[in-house]
Amino acid sequence: KFNKNLSNQLNFDEKIFWTKVKNFDSKGYFVTTFDSSEPTLKFANKPYIINAKFFDHLPYHPYTIDEVKIIIENIYGINFKEPPMKYWPEIRDDWISSIFESRSNEEWLELSQKYNLSGIIVPSNWEIKINEKVISEKYILYKLQ
């Protein structure tokens, strides 16, 4: 007997949102948050630049440290050597929301060009200075390409 996997359940609004994200013609990575990393990959089949929920792989794959440092500092705006919370392998929304919201459209487009970013998926109450977007009750996709 199989049990129903509740983690695969989406309400109607979220199902529409993730279908739109999935159908978004993109070739780059997506910047995600603590809560949007997993569904970006799971429901939209889109690659994230880093899993903001956890990146505890560094001790096992030290050759990735330089790239992770660049992503965390340049895209997420967090000091790699002095993070808000030491020994915490995640990026919390409250650490980055004001950084993301304070960037101009031009700054986001520069990051998009430099790091091959197609979009940003954040909680729906964040206001990022990008016009083209897809909105749901829970998330917003800001399109960069």
Residue ranges of each PLM-predicted region?
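Short glycine/proline- and acidic residue-enriched helix-loop micro-motifs
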Residues: N3, E90-D94
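Structural motif corresponding to alpha-helix initiation and N-cap regions
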Residues: K15, F34, S102-E106
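Aromatic/acidic, Gly/Pro-rich catalytic loop(s) in extracytoplasmic/lumenal soluble domains
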Residues: D93-D94, F100-Q145
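A short linear-motif detector with a strong N-terminal bias
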Residues: N8-N11, G28, S98-E101
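Transmembrane alpha-helical segments
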Residues: K1-N8
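Short periplasmic/luminal acceptor-recognition loop of GT-C membrane glycosyltransferases, typified by
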Residues: N11-F12, T19-I91, L111, L117-W126
